[in-house]
Amino acid sequence: LSGRLPMTSEIKAHLEIMRHRPDVRAIVHAHPPNATAFAVAREPVPKCVLPEIEMFIGELPMTPYATPGTRDFAESLVPFLRHHNAFLLASHGALTVGADPFEAYYRMETIEQYCRILILAKQIGGWTQIAPERVLDLLRIREKLGWPDRRVTQGADLCSPGVPPAGADRAGDMQPLIAEVVRRVLERLGRLPAGPREPGP
């Protein structure tokens, strides 16, 4: 690619990626709405749901928030570069890498479609994970294609959700408290019959 336009403001991040990953020749950084929805919610993207994701993307980690365009942003990617080709950027967007522009673009399109599928699935009852032993079959095929996955180890936890960045607010953790507060308010207003409280922890 060539041209006379100014360089991306994320040139520091691009150079840092290529310094740590000599195989990377193309980077796509975008803000697609569905993937970015997960990023701004800091909601870990579930694993073991769609075979195509396990085969062609693998884990989709979320990097910690850092100010765009800064050295901190570039360095926030480094711990994830060795094992991943696609990332959600907390409160920001998404980034994918590849051996050429098509591969990096394909990965971006794939994670955006996956996030869209997850959002739709949640609206009709949620998703069901594939059994870990079946996922392991997919990861072994992936390895044979030359795409090793660090989860193919003895006793690896294949399907647990990703971990959000340290300090991330998790609205989901508040749901039991919110439900209890709403129940008590409705009960006091006489709109809900008094009943036994659910046992606490």
Located regions from the model:
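Intrinsic disorder/low-complexity segments
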Residues: 196-200
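Glycine-rich flexible loops
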Residues: 1-194
